[in-house]
Amino acid sequence: MVDVLGGRRLVTRDGAWVEAEAALQNKVVALYFAAGRCAPSRDFTPLLSRFYEALVDEARPPAPFEVVFVSADDSAQDMLAFMSELHGAWLALPFQDPLRHELRARYRITTIPKLVIVKPSGEVITDKGRMQIRERGLACFQNWVEVADVFRNFFG
């Protein structure tokens, strides 16, 4: 994902800016296409937040995983409200960044919410991340790491 987002800055739900390259290097990345006005997005986001917390905030060492929210909201204010209300402590592509539209086209996003799991190169591991989390919970992450070929010994 560094290949796609390298040189860009991402924003946290608290409004802090981070360099994408440093934040995403050697990680499995989940691109989360969603919007606060969308009931299925509002339904899935708390589950994704718990999944993220278990892998990143509570695990020692933290899992090589990061979520990048790609908003389909109608305004920057709507995006920030959705992030502050329901999102985990993950990252987001700024609302004004035109890459939001390019990513929707690149990953063929036609409905939301959609969770696309990608390798560091941006190559798709699965575009069924939402379903896999719902059906398999944390167990799906090990498969993603193996396919992504990052931190071979993470589960070691």
Regions found by a protein language model. Give the residues of each.
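A short beta-strand-turn-helix
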Residues: V4-V29, A54-D57
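Short coil/turn segments at secondary-structure boundaries
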Residues: D43-P46, L80-S84, A105-R106, G129-M131
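Conserved redox-active cysteine motifs that mediate thiol-disulfide chemistry
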Residues: K27, F33-E53
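Thiol-based oxidoreductase modules, predominantly thioredoxin-like and allied folds used
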Residues: R60-D78, L86-L99
